[in-house]
Amino acid sequence: MESRVGHYYRLDETYRVGREKVREYARAVQDYHPAHWDMAAAEKLGYSGLVTPLTFTSIPAMAANRYLFESVVVGYDTYMQTEEVFEQHRPIVADDELHVDVELSSVRRIAGRDLITVTNTFTDTAGERVHTLHTTVVGITAEDVDPAIKSAVQNTIMHDVNILEIAAADAAYQKTVRPEGEIRIADGGTTRTPGTPSFDDVQVGDELPVRHARLSRGDLVNYSGVAGDANPIHWDENIAKLAGLPDVIAHGMLTMGLGAGFLSAWSGDPGAVTRYAVRLSQPAVVSAAEGADIEYSGRIKSLDPATRTGVVIVAAKSGGRKIFGLATLNVRFS
């Protein structure tokens, strides 16, 4: 796989951000900040349209990455998400039209397993990169899962989707790489005055109010549909156990979306985050009978007076276990 690092392609069609899709995704991640729902609230913060939740880019990224995991990254039975980094160069708003790029950016061998990182870049029609998303997954082979899982998935999953189809190395494979040229990074995320607390009013060590998020199996099914995530480990108990899990688990991206909403509920401005990095440690188990409770807490780790920015650490726990190994958000203060 190392020889395929650098493989790149751009989708032929652009992705247009729909106003109702913004609201639909915000509802799926339980983010009720007014800027995701109400134009007047978004305009008050200086936006030209409804602001997307920070993790919204996972929707077009998942669709764009499908070809990569079907034809370029080969030899694995399934994948487990481990890390995610969102770089918000400027907030994405409704009616933005985005070019979506995909690049296999690294393959690392650690403790006998391959860690595969894919980078998605989102460029607006003005030619400026507005968002960069780095996704790291662990490639899982047949030795790590019950052999019955393949037939179980095929009998359960919707038509035209086969997440466990293992492609072999293709002798006709041809590597395509990112074309050379200047990359222009949008600066809208650093020039707009954020609607966050004043830098002078926050201190290192300040704690964010604790928030609890409840998840049911219905929430997981809804998120699967909204985000286009067909993996049945998020709604089928039998398949989850065949995959070596204790029960159905929440999407890692859903727990990250809840975390981003937790931060913006405190800060007052979802577009004030310039970077959000999460390392997952344990999945959030969602039982059919009781669902799951996820507790989010946070504190200001550091402050930079030169840029009036800070780093906030967010912790997430469910069932007495940490589901975030480490999560940090870089925030602009007013």
Regions found by a protein language model. Name each.
Residues 81-83, 90-203, 286-334:
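HotDog/MaoC-like acyl-thioester-processing domains
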Residues 88, 215, 280, 331-333:
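Hydrophobic residues in beta-strands and at strand termini
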Residues 247, 258-301:
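Catalytic-pocket segment enriched in acidic/His residues
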